[in-house]
């Protein structure tokens, strides 16, 4: 189910505070966050946010097409290594 339109989009308060502080300074620096569930809002456009994927923080530059999506969508948590090699010797 999608979130009700009566409610506002979820953004972690600590992340929102950091973005508003950088917007008043007009400085660009990487914001580190573990909040993958936060929704991208228009005030985040132009910032680089390092999103935690379970092992490291992946920097993501926010553009206008990302508004409305969650931060976790842009930092993959699983690295697909490929399917197992088809080994015919082990079957015999």
Curated annotation (Swiss-Prot):
Pfam families: Ribosomal_S19. One of its GO terms (biological process) is ribosomal small subunit assembly. PROSITE patterns: RIBOSOMAL_S19 (PS00323). Gene3D superfamilies: 30s Ribosomal Protein S19, Chain A. The keyword NAD does not apply. Keywords: Chloroplast, Plastid, Ribonucleoprotein, Ribosomal protein, RNA-binding, rRNA-binding. InterPro entries: Ribosomal_uS19, Ribosomal_uS19_bac-type, Ribosomal_uS19_CS, Ribosomal_uS19_SF. GO terms for cellular component: chloroplast; mitochondrial small ribosomal subunit. It is found in: Plastid, Chloroplast. It comes from the Eukaryota. One of its GO terms (molecular function) is structural constituent of ribosome. The keyword rRNA-binding applies. Protein S19 forms a complex with S13 that binds strongly to the 16S ribosomal RNA. Belongs to the universal ribosomal protein uS19 family. This is Small ribosomal subunit protein uS19c. It comes from Draba nemorosa (Woodland whitlowgrass).
């Amino acid at each position: 189910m999608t979130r009700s339109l009566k409610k506002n989009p979820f953004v972690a308060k600590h992340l929102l505070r950091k973005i508003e502080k950088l917007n008043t300074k007009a400085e660009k620096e990487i914001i580190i966050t573990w909040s993958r569930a936060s929704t991208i809002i228009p005030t985040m456009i132009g910032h680089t946010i390092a999103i935690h994927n379970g092992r490291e923080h992946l920097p993501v530059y926010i553009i206008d097409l990302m508004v409305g999506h969650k931060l976790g969508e842009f930092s993959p948590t699983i690295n697909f290594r490929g399917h197992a090699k088809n080994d015919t010797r082990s079957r015999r």
